[in-house]
A protein has these predicted regions:
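Conserved ATP-binding module of the ATP-grasp superfamily
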Residues: 56-59, 78-82, 97-135, 139, ...
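Short, acidic/turn-prone active-site loops that include or flank metal/cofactor-
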Residues: 33-38, 109, 152-154
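Active-site charged/polar residues at nucleotide-handling catalytic sites that mediate phosphoryl
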Residues: 1, 76
Length: 158
């Protein structure tokens, strides 16, 4: 018995290059390679990509220094605000802070206490947007794009 095709879905193996490794070993694999998976694996990369190509996204700032992030929060004095660990954090790396104090605490937890390990070396602080969150995904081979059915994440996840 041999392996015909491997579907790689979890974020960590995709970001770590599992599809690349399978293909190098001659095993057909379905999923993005590591270069494409960075869109999901790095909030900083994805936000900067959206900005570069004019894709609408929430106003944001990126920080690699906790004190600079805290100073920004104090100067902006806006809540609620969203604090995101840059890297993968098993779906737990997004904190919706309802107050300035909560936002400062989120920065400390992520960057100083290393709540999400190295995934919190950089953070994104972005404006809080209201409304439904919808995911739109598509299959592509680099030439042709086939959209999937859109989905809506229940707000209770946050």
């Amino acid at each position: 018995m041999s392996i015909d095709l491997v579907f790689v879905a979890p974020d960590d193996p995709l970001a770590d290059g599992m599809v690349d490794a399978m293909q190098e070993a001659g095993i057909r694999a379905f999923g993005p390679n590591a270069n494409a998976a960075i869109i999901e694996a790095s909030k900083v990369f994805s936000k900067n990509l959206m900005k570069k190509y004019g894709i609408p996204t929430a106003k944001y700032e990126v920080f690699n220094d906790a004190q600079k992030a805290i100073d920004y929060i104090k100067n902006e004095n806006t809540a609620p605000v969203v604090v995101k660990a840059d890297g993968l954090a098993l779906g737990k790396g997004v904190i919706i802070a309802q107050s300035v104090d909560e936002a400062i605490e989120a920065v400390k937890e992520i960057m100083e206490d290393k709540k999400f390990g190295d995934s919190g070396n950089n953070i994104v602080i972005e404006e809080f947007l209201t409304g439904p969150e919808v995911s739109v995904l598509a299959f592509t081979d680099g030439k042709c794009v086939k959209p999937m059915v859109s989905s809506k994440r229940p707000q209770a996840c946050f």
